[in-house]
Amino acid sequence: MSQLTQIWIKRMHRGPMDPVSSAKVVSGRGIVGNANQGGKRQVTIVSSQNWEDITAPLGATPDPRLRRANLLVSDVDFVDSRGKLLKIGKVRIRIYGETRPCEQMEAAVPGLQKAMSVPWGGGAFGEVLDDGEIAVGDAVALVGDQGSH
């Protein structure tokens, strides 16, 4: 079963990724306390299996916090997920696209930006559709389009 394994909040642009065990989310805004609010990139998500696969050629699996995503989920393949819904507990997130790796990846680990340049290698981003709370251990499912609300 897929689950939410990590949550990180970025309190300011280019700031550290602070781990938390749960977070409140607001429809149309994102994670409460996170620097990215509103728009289509309210939440960024990476899959642990994908992270392990793309970083394997680097010789060691770096801490996924270096990806600078808000959420780490297990057993989810984001390839062709644009427009689908990611359900985390009772909260839905509409996936709008893939997150592209930036120069911060290369600064963190030499070769990481290139390793992440494969399709969907940087994970996904999306918009929160429901107010609620998410917590490490919540069940996760990627499902087809079920409308916006």
Residue ranges: model-predicted function:
Residues 1-149:
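Metal-cofactor-dependent catalytic cores
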